[in-house]
Structure formats: structure tokens, C-alpha cells
Amino acid sequence: MSSLPADSRIDFAGSPRPTVGVEWEFALVDAKTRELSNEAAAVIAEIGENPHVHKELLRNTVEIVTGICENSGEAMGDLCDTLSTVRRAVRGRGMELFCAGTHPFGKWSAAQLTDAPRYAELIKRTQWWGRQMLIWGVHVHVGVSSAHKVMPIISSLLNQYPHLLALSASSPFWDGEDTGYASNRAMMFQQLPTAGLPFQFQTWHEFEGFVHDQKKTGIIDHLSEIRWDIRPSPQLGTVEVRIFDGVSNVRELSALVALTHCLIVDLDRRLDAGEQLPVMPPWHVQENKWRAARYGLDAVIILDADSNERLVTEDLDDLLNHLEPVAASLHCADELAAVEDIYRLGGSYQRQRRVAEENDGDLREVVDALIGELEL
């Protein structure tokens, strides 16, 4: 790659320790009808200035975020403190908090856009697809010490993309219909320009060159407009994993955060040991994303560049065993072990379908069940 202008350099803050942070998106639903409610602005105004409560693209959404935490357990404590504050304000206005990748019968046409120039510009550019973004997710940040590690970690972490998506898949329904997918959200979000799978760069210089080209050609104005499923967060000094569908309860969220934390720290330590991290051809990565979105925990995934395949839950058994020493060092062994409960007991998309079947297809009961899970 040719040399870049000096102003194209992107400074990566770097994290002295492998800390973790979480962003958790919630929808607001009417307590009686279970329909989405566009009252986020009023809720946030009532709560007042709070760095842990954010607005999002749609006025039916509130996001809560942690500070800088050492492990999953600390992050859950941070989130739960904020969650209790937000829930009081929400319930005081006749609403409930709901979290899944999609709302089972929500109508995108009824959603209102949050008043902010960047959101208006997004919809102006993306039009119909942008207005379809009636979706919710979880983002996990893990601190990385230096820029040269970031792209190798991201490129190798894509090997575990289907594991993370299958475990969190919680969006089988769209506009009142069963889509046949475990994660319809994953299929929807990638329709936005600059969203979807990251390019498998190996150096920070390649990433800087990509961003330079994106800005020069008017594709983006700001780095935050790169909406990859896994991306660098240079200001925070983190790798940000954005694969997860919305997670409806603290128990599963804690497990998924621990898994993400351990995966990235494991890759980081392997780099320190001089290992060249494994990567797969992008066509395998793309296929794995689709298989996990379609089949969830029943997906047979591609494991490596040699095209070997295996049931994702069987591979998770070995992955969890491999990560046990990392989890012990990060003081999240119990949280990592709880990952197994998700695929042994059933994922969110499976629970939602079961509730719908048991209630003659009444999707309000699905919303009720998900609201109830947040109490756990």
C-alpha cells in the first residue's frame, strides 16, 4: 500500500490491561399492549444526566453502558445498577423494558427517529433499508494494548463468529411472522453500507488506508460510521464485538461477555507468544455467518481453511475447555462455564418459538416471556 498523508494516521489509545465494557440496547414496550413505545426521550429526560444511559437511532430504544470493568462479573454489577434506575423510570410511565434481536410483531413504519443530525443523515442515505432497522443488540469492548495486534485479533476472531451469533440468536420473528431464521437481525443489519463482516486486514496500516479511502470517496465522514460486526474502537483502545442479538437476561449476558473477553485475551496472549493467528478464507467466514443466522445452535459450521465442518455446539465444548485457564486468570470461570447452559437448555430463539407454539401463535405472550426473563 502506498504511503498515506500524515492526517490519515489513526491513533489507537491502547489499554494497559485487557479490560471489558458492555453496551446493552433495550426496547420500550407498552405494559398493556406490548407494542413498541416511542418514549425514550421522555425516559432519558426523567433520569437526567447519566453517562451510562444513551439514546439510539430510534425513539423506542434506550441503551445502558458500563464503565471500564475488569471482568464480566464487574460489568454485570455495573449494568444492573443502571438497569434498576432505568426500569423505575420506564415502569413509572406505563412501560416495560424488552430485549431481543427483534420485536416479534413490531412495525418499522410506526417507529420514530431520534432527533439528531447523524441519524437523519443515515436515513437520508440508506432510505428503505435504514428505516427497517427495528433491531437491538449487545456490543462488547475488550481492551487491547497496541494497534499492531488489533487487526490480527479481529481477523482470527471471525473463526468464532458463528459460535457467538448462534449462542445469542434471539430474532426469529419479524413483523408478526416466523422468518425461519434464528437471527433475522444479523441478516437485516448487514444491509446498511459499511455494516457486516470486516475486511480481514493483518496490519493497522491497511486499516488506516481503508479509512482514508472511505473518507476520500465520501462513503464515511467519521470513523464511527464503519459499522462492522467486529471493529476497532481507537479512542477507547478496544476491539468492539457487535455480533450479538439482544440478550434478554443477565445470566446469559454475563456468559457471553465472559466468552468474548476470554476469546480476545487468548488471541492477544498467543500473539505475545509469537504465534501466527489462524484465519479462514472470507468465503468460509461469510458462509458461517449465514449458517449461524439461519440455523442457530443447530448450525454445522466450517472450522478452518481446510473446509472441515462440525456442529457448532460440539465445537463449543472444546472451545470452552481451551479457554478455562484464561477465564481463571480473568476471574470469570463461573461465567464462562455458564455458556454451556445456553446450548444445553436452549437459546432465546428456541424459547420464543416454544412460547408461540404453546400459545397458539400469540406473539404478545412471547413479549411477556422476554420481559419476564429480565427479572432473572
UniProtKB/Swiss-Prot annotation:
EC number of this enzyme: 6.3.2.2
Source organism, top-level taxon: Bacteria
GO molecular function: ATP binding; glutamate-cysteine ligase activity
Entries under InterPro entries matching the protein: GCL_type2/YbdK_subfam, GCS2, Gln_synth/guanido_kin_cat_dom, YbdK
Catalytic activity entry: L-cysteine + L-glutamate + ATP = gamma-L-glutamyl-L-cysteine + ADP + phosphate + H(+)
One GO term (biological process): modified amino acid biosynthetic process
A Pfam entry, by short name: GCS2
EC top class named in words: ligase
UniProt keyword annotations, A-Z: ATP-binding, Ligase, Nucleotide-binding
Function: ATP-dependent carboxylate-amine ligase which exhibits weak glutamate--cysteine ligase activity.
Stated family: Belongs to the glutamate--cysteine ligase type 2 family. YbdK subfamily.
Protein name per its UniProtKB record: Putative glutamate--cysteine ligase 2-1
